């Protein structure tokens, strides 16, 4: 879990995940949406996300297309919901005192 959190801790990678959440995009489209980031940096972030299993990639000609692998984020979601639920339970207990 900690390695997954390390991967998504980078703001640029979170932005890339947001961009590929609902539709497939090629690396060039992702770079166009983030003009302040070099194409090389976008490629490196995509490689990290892909290695972590957070994005799927497919090649079509000379282009690579990326899409978020939402099903692989399930364990992270469950962990965050548990943490959030525990925090809310503690807050409720304190409020009732």
Regions found by a protein language model. Name each.
Residues 46-47:
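Short, hydrophobic-biased segments on the C-terminal half of alpha helices
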Residues 2-38, 63-74:
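N-terminal helix-turn-helix DNA-binding core of bacterial DNA-binding proteins
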Residues 41:
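Residues in the helix-turn-helix
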Residues 50-61, 67:
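Beta-hairpin "wing" of winged helix-turn-helix
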Residues 18-22, 73-97:
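Amphipathic alpha-helical dimerization/coiled-coil segments
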